[in-house]
């Protein structure tokens, strides 16, 4: 029975899953939007949102915790200098999942996962309005 077991297995062993979500979390912090399957996007929220909450209060201890979870100094720098201050007033819900159809090869449901309030999104809306 799988009672009280949270999270999805995604047909991977635990180390592969941990490495995959670590890499995806680094990618979403760098690019602020990535395209992936819906199941992976929903699981990625559980990794990224606590990182951003950690970045809202800048301290050496929090930077070390973020580095332990991402293993990327560039990503930790962006988290604490850009994303933490940007989401200072928001009490959670830092990501948005937008479904975007099915993948060509295997019809897997795909989605964009993006950070809420990213600057590029506002510019794109203005361009399409003109």
Swiss-Prot record:
PROSITE patterns hit by this protein: RIBOSOMAL_L17
GO function terms (MF aspect): structural constituent of ribosome
Gene3D superfamilies according to UniProt: Ribosomal protein L17 (3.90.1030.10)
Lineage: superkingdom: Bacteria
Subunit: Part of the 50S ribosomal subunit. Contacts protein L32.
Family, per entry: Belongs to the bacterial ribosomal protein bL17 family.
Protein name as catalogued: Large ribosomal subunit protein bL17
Species this chain originates from: Shewanella pealeana (strain ATCC 700345 / ANG-SQ1)
Lineage: Bacteria, Pseudomonadati, Pseudomonadota, Gammaproteobacteria, Alteromonadales
Gene name per UniProt: rplQ
């Amino acid at each position: 029975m799988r009672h009280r077991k949270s999270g999805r297995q995604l047909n991977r062993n635990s180390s592969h899953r941990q490495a995959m979500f670590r890499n995806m979390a680094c990618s979403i912090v760098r690019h602020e939007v990535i395209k992936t399957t819906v199941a992976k996007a929903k699981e990625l929220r559980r990794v990224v949102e606590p990182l951003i909450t950690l970045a809202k209060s800048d301290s050496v201890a929090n930077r070390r915790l973020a580095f332990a979870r991402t293993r990327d100094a560039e990503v930790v720098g962006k988290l604490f200098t850009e994303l933490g201050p940007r989401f200072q007033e928001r009490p959670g819900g830092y990501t948005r999942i937008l479904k975007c159809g099915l993948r060509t090869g295997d019809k897997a449901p795909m989605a964009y996962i993006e950070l809420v309030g990213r600057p590029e999104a506002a510019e794109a809306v203005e361009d399409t309005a003109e």
